[in-house]
Amino acid sequence: MDKIYISNQVKLEILRICGQPTHKAYNLPGNLTLDIFNYGYNEELCRILEQKLQEIASQYQTGKIILPGDVCKNHTVSECIKMVFA
């Protein structure tokens, strides 16, 4: 699958999980940290994102495994994207 498509899917999930508008998820800059989107105030959001990243990795058979605790508020959007690629 196209890496750009998967990257945009990750960006969409980052925004969707925290309740932000998703209509232009593809424009989300890679250098933004998750705490900007309130992931720092609610640890459960990180756990949900981990599950979604694992679903994306499994769906597109990237070979990556995302475990509980792998995502934290200090991760950037780019780091989250890299988690799903082998």
Model-derived features: positions:
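Phosphopantetheine-dependent thiolation modules in NRPS/PKS and related acyl-activating systems
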Residues: M1-E55, Y60-A86
